Amino acid sequence: MSLVANLKLSIGSKNNEFVLRDVQLWETSDTSILDAGQLKRVQSYKGRFVAYVDIKKLPLWIKNQQSRELQCFTRSSTTLRYFSTKLGVKQRGIVFECIPLTEKADNQGCCSYYIFYRNENVVKVVQVDLSIKANIDLQIKQIKSTLSNPQQADVKKLDSTVSATIDSRLNSDITKIVSENIERHEHRTSKVLKSMLSNDKKIQVRDTLSKLILAGLRLRGLSSTKSETQKLFRITLSASEFAHRKDLIQLQRGHTKAIPFEEMQETVETLLNLFTRNG
């Protein structure tokens, strides 16, 4: 990792301004070994709060291949508390507008806006390069102009670089988002179906055990309307389920299809004989 910038960020109003200090931005690429010349390129910036944004609703062009994703570190407890609190809201991002502290600072290739957001326990930062959007807008404008003036240019001979640029920047992101959404939907659907099936099997086992217990009680001449018999029924059912707890776990995990009827019948008979032998 390599340190690329130090920021001082202003929050609050003009009359009640507060500055977050020691906001360090680090690049996480593997090519982070610095030589003596690179160490001098770390710049200092001052910034101001702009707005909160929903990370999920950011335009696709913001996180394309040309955007630099950084990690934020700090030694300031105040700065740490600020980001921990403000980024505690799910999917929230914080936008800051930043400018160099010195006029001589090399600002080429740097973005004017930084979006801070939380990814698990790490605060990450995306540098927003507005020139990308301006370039895309210009290219779209050129395409619309060409389509609206077919006499000035052949629509079939549109500049291939325009299409290639838009496709490479947008289609790859769109395909990735669609694919991820499909995978998440399939995973949720599969999980719900699996849960429904396991619950259904568990209910079937409980129903079978209940019927076996009631049949066993009738064979012993015990009336199901008496409170003592009902208590015996509940105790036997709980004990039967406990006896087959490992089988029920295997059912829920899908490792076995069903518990053999004979095994459940034997369990119920054994328990009823045990509970009624002194009756």
Swiss-Prot record:
Keyword check for Transcription: no
Gene Ontology cellular-component annotations: chromosome, centromeric region; cytoplasm; DNA replication preinitiation complex; spindle pole
Matches recorded under Pfam families: Sld7_C (PF18596), Sld7_N (PF18636)
Location in or out of the cell: Nucleus; Cytoplasm, Cytoskeleton, Spindle pole
Assigned keywords, A-Z: Cell cycle, Cytoplasm, Cytoskeleton, DNA replication, Nucleus
The family this protein is said to belong to: Belongs to the SLD7 family.
Function noted in UniProt: Required for the proper initiation of DNA replication. Required for mitochondrial morphology.
Name of protein: Mitochondrial morphogenesis protein SLD7
Source species: Candida glabrata (strain ATCC 2001 / BCRC 20586 / JCM 3761 / NBRC 0622 / NRRL Y-65 / CBS 138)
Name of the encoding gene: SLD7
